[in-house]
Amino acid sequence: MAAIPSSGSLVATHDYYRRRLGSTSSNSSCGSVDYSGEVIPHHPGLPKSDPGHWWASFFFGKPTHPVMTTVSESPENSGSFRITSGLVPCGLVQESVLKQKVGDTKSDSSPSA
């Protein structure tokens, strides 16, 4: 079984891969500007990214799709939808328009009193 270090965390808090051993850097993992120590040159085979945040693209990468909007079903009419903000996916718009047109033709064709 692996032992947990006394610091209680397995997350790297220093940029060891960027500095030569023996350099003194701050304990901050936020990519502070004042590093002392020799910078190791970037390997040409590796992708370049923001300093200190190479892992961020795995969790907070740029979205490939537009941001989805919140669509909620109206409690009083179980068939109607309310769009709160943003873009609407094309399929949802077409489906909503078709349902609306079918509902309008039914209400128009019914005899009025």
UniProtKB/Swiss-Prot annotation:
Domain of life of the native organism: Eukaryota
GO biological process, one term: cell differentiation
Keywords, alphabetical: Developmental protein, Differentiation
Record flagged with keyword Protein biosynthesis: no
Keyword Glycosyltransferase: no
Pfam families, alphabetized: PPDFL (PF15060)
Cited InterPro entries: PPDPF (IPR026754)
Function of the molecule: Probable regulator of exocrine pancreas development.
PANTHER family per UniProt: PANCREATIC PROGENITOR CELL DIFFERENTIATION AND PROLIFERATION FACTOR (PTHR14572)
Protein family (similarity comment): Belongs to the PPDPF family.
Protein name (record): Pancreatic progenitor cell differentiation and proliferation factor B
Organism of provenance: Xenopus laevis (African clawed frog)
Lineage: Eukaryota, Metazoa, Chordata, Craniata, Vertebrata
